[in-house]
Amino acid sequence: MSPQTETKAMVGFKAGVKDYKLTYYTPDYETKDTDILAAFRVTPQPGVPPEEAGAAVA
């Protein structure tokens, strides 16, 4: 039999899902000549925040 080993999670890693709105907004972003603007119309299902529905497209 092989010896058992213990696996530990990396330091700083927490399981779970972060709200997308916490990570997508970058107020200091400067546009570039190569940036492309795309627009999507998203209608969230009942009970789904608009930001999270938009994250599914992003």
Curated annotation (Swiss-Prot):
GO terms for cellular component: chloroplast. GO terms for molecular function: monooxygenase activity; ribulose-bisphosphate carboxylase activity. It is found in: Plastid, Chloroplast. Pfam families: RuBisCO_large_N (PF02788). The keyword Plastid applies. One of its GO terms (biological process) is photorespiration. It catalyses: 2 (2R)-3-phosphoglycerate + 2 H(+) = D-ribulose 1,5-bisphosphate + CO2 + H2O; D-ribulose 1,5-bisphosphate + O2 = 2-phosphoglycolate + (2R)-3-phosphoglycerate + 2 H(+). Keywords: Acetylation, Calvin cycle, Carbon dioxide fixation, Chloroplast, Lyase, Methylation, Monooxygenase, Oxidoreductase, Photorespiration, Photosynthesis, Plastid. It is an enzyme of class 4 (lyase). The modification N6,N6,N6-trimethyllysine is found at K14. Its EC number is 4.1.1.39. Its main location: plastid. The modification N-acetylproline is found at P3. Residues 1-2 form a propeptide. Heterohexadecamer of 8 large chains and 8 small chains. Belongs to the RuBisCO large chain family. Type I subfamily. The basic functional RuBisCO is composed of a large chain homodimer in a 'head-to-tail' conformation. In form I RuBisCO this homodimer is arranged in a barrel-like tetramer with the small subunits forming a tetrameric 'cap' on each end of the 'barrel'. RuBisCO catalyzes two reactions: the carboxylation of D-ribulose 1,5-bisphosphate, the primary event in carbon dioxide fixation, as well as the oxidative fragmentation of the pentose substrate in the photorespiration process. Both reactions occur simultaneously and in competition at the same active site. This is Ribulose bisphosphate carboxylase large chain.
